[in-house]
Amino acid sequence: MTTGSRIVLHVDMDSFFASIEVRRDPSLAGRPVIVGADPKGGAGRGVVSTCSYEARRYGVHSGMPISRAFDLCPHGVYLPVDRPFYASVSVEIMALLSRHAGRIEQVSIDEAYLDVSDAGSFPAAGALAAAIKREVREETGLTCSVGVAPGKAVAKIASDFQKPDGLTIVRPDEVAGFLASLPVGRIPGIGKKTGEDLRQAGILTVGDLARRDVQEVIARLGRSGVRVHHLARGIDDGEVQGREGCKSISRETTFEADTADPPVLAGTLAELADDVAETLRADNLRCRTVTVKVRYRGFQTHTRSRTLPRFTSDPETIRRAASGLLLPFLNGEPVRLIGVRLSMLEGGCTRQASIDEFFS
């Protein structure tokens, strides 16, 4: 179990894109809002970027093929992704968070880690988290969920524990107990298929995983097995990475169910490419190298990169490069995770480097 004085907050905006759309048009409040591809004009291709909690009651979720979402919720409100507007709101939120921590690590457009060790105690950090939630609501009209823990991984799990608009505090001596009864799939890096494989092996909870020998876990999960086994035993040493440098910008997503569907994979990758391109432009940066990452069902992870002839921040150029890199991965093998990274950056950097796990 982690000991020491580190206190980490994970702040995760609730249904970010959909919530912004409801803020922009209050008549959408209480209705199933789905942000993503056009289910009709796009011939049913593409995926759901995010959706409101009302839409989730019909089984709709992020990463789902938009055609499936329309089957489940034909009466939903389907809206296109307005990435520049969402990015501008993200800048507001990150500026707000920066007022409360000297070290902040933004890991996506709608989530960040804060090192609040200076708070001095977990009760004080909990009060700070409550104040942050209140400020976010008052200043942006949006809600967020916050996890407070000794390390990043547990803080992230905790932020998802009472969504939406939740606050969960896990003190150092509570980490192992907090994790023990959770389904094994709640550990970051364990997807739906691997979770099912573990359950068939009798590993149903995080506690079950903690009791297994680390070599068995490595055999099942590969090189991520050590990290996962440590976390299952309450060892969470993840530190918040600050603004010491901006070496790359990354975005990735894990599918709810593994998919080999080329339109779904291509549509998801295009969304991710647009996301990182928007972040690049917002930070006044340009890139030369585009990398696509694919993780298959068996946790085999592969990357392909292309160095462009010149520095660029053009979304279409980045999207085309990413799409070309994806083609060799469309081999019929089910994909668990897909991601895009931009590197070889030049220009002013106002954000943090992405967490190493994105492209490890």
UniProtKB/Swiss-Prot annotation:
Q: What does this protein do?
A: Poorly processive, error-prone DNA polymerase involved in untargeted mutagenesis. Copies undamaged DNA at stalled replication forks, which arise in vivo from mismatched or misaligned primer ends. These misaligned primers can be extended by PolIV. Exhibits no 3'-5' exonuclease (proofreading) activity. May be involved in translesional synthesis.
Give the main localization category. Answer: cytoplasm
Give me the comment on cofactor binding: Binds 2 magnesium ions per subunit.
Kindly give the Pfam families that the UniProt entry links to this protein. Answer: IMS, IMS_C, IMS_HHH
Q: Which organism is it from?
A: Methanoculleus marisnigri (strain ATCC 35101 / DSM 1498 / JR1)
Q: Where in the cell is it found?
A: Cytoplasm
- Per the database record, which ranges form the UmuC domain? 8-191
Q: Which HAMAP family match?
A: DNApol_IV (MF_01113)
Q: Per UniProt, where does Mg(2+) bind?
A: 12, 110
Q: Name one GO molecular function term.
A: magnesium ion binding
The prosthetic group or cofactor this protein requires is: Mg(2+)
An example of a Gene Ontology cellular component annotation for this protein is: cytoplasm
State the family it belongs to. Belongs to the DNA polymerase type-Y family.
Q: Site described as Substrate discrimination, positions?
A: 17
Q: What residues form the catalytic site here?
A: 111
Self-association or partners: how does it assemble? Answer: Monomer.
SUPFAM superfamilies, sorted:
DNA/RNA polymerases, Lesion bypass DNA polymerase (Y-family), little finger domain
Tell me which InterPro entries the record gives. Answer: DNA/RNA_pol_sf (IPR043502), DNA_pol_Y-fam_lit_finger_sf (IPR036775), DNA_pol_Y-fam_little_finger (IPR017961), DNA_polymerase-Y (IPR050116), DNApol_IV (IPR022880), PolY_HhH_motif (IPR024728), Rev_trsase/Diguanyl_cyclase (IPR043128), UmuC (IPR001126)
**Carries keyword Nucleotidyltransferase?**
yes
Q: What is this protein called?
A: DNA polymerase IV
Q: Which UniProt keywords apply?
A: Cytoplasm, DNA damage, DNA repair, DNA replication, DNA-binding, DNA-directed DNA polymerase, Magnesium, Metal-binding, Mutator protein, Nucleotidyltransferase, Transferase
For this protein, the Enzyme Commission number is: 2.7.7.7
Q: Does the keyword DNA repair apply?
A: yes
Gene Ontology biological process terms in this record: DNA-templated DNA replication; error-prone translesion synthesis
Q: Tell me what gene encodes this.
A: dbh
